[in-house]
Swiss-Prot record:
One of its GO terms (molecular function) is rRNA binding. It comes from the Bacteria. Keywords: Ribonucleoprotein, Ribosomal protein, RNA-binding, rRNA-binding. Part of the 50S ribosomal subunit. This is Large ribosomal subunit protein uL15. Binds to the 23S rRNA. The gene is rplO. It comes from Deinococcus geothermalis (strain DSM 11300 / CIP 105573 / AG-3a).
Amino acid sequence: MKLHDLTPAPGSRKPKKRVGRGPGGTDKTAGRGHKGQKSRSGAGKGPFFEGGRSTLISRLPKRGFNNVGTTYEVVNLAQLARVEGDTLDRTALERAGLVRRKDRPVKLLARGQVTRAVTVQVDAASEAAIRAVEAAGGRVVVTGADRQNAEQAG
């Protein structure tokens, strides 16, 4: 005996009734009764319907707001010494553990000193950070991806 030889015992599985297909399928109204919301196709009340009164969600007060300001993942100049390589982009910063949130743009700030010439590729950078990296012989490439994301979102 193999797996495909197994069948359920006779009478143990009742066939599905096809409603609305003649007298056996309880005929015309197919067990839905006459007219009304529940007789219609696709009809029914939503899970939060409360019989017509104001729902709980609309009775509770509004709270908070959506801040449209961009929240950055901040990387400071002093932290760049921990990252190996001459080109420091988002993936290099993520590997070094300086950037954790993938949904936020990266911004370079000027706290600390740069000890070597590096090329830093970030979404945004402060003017002081750009000056400090260029003074050390490196360069900062500002991609501005956060602006593109903001335009797409709003």
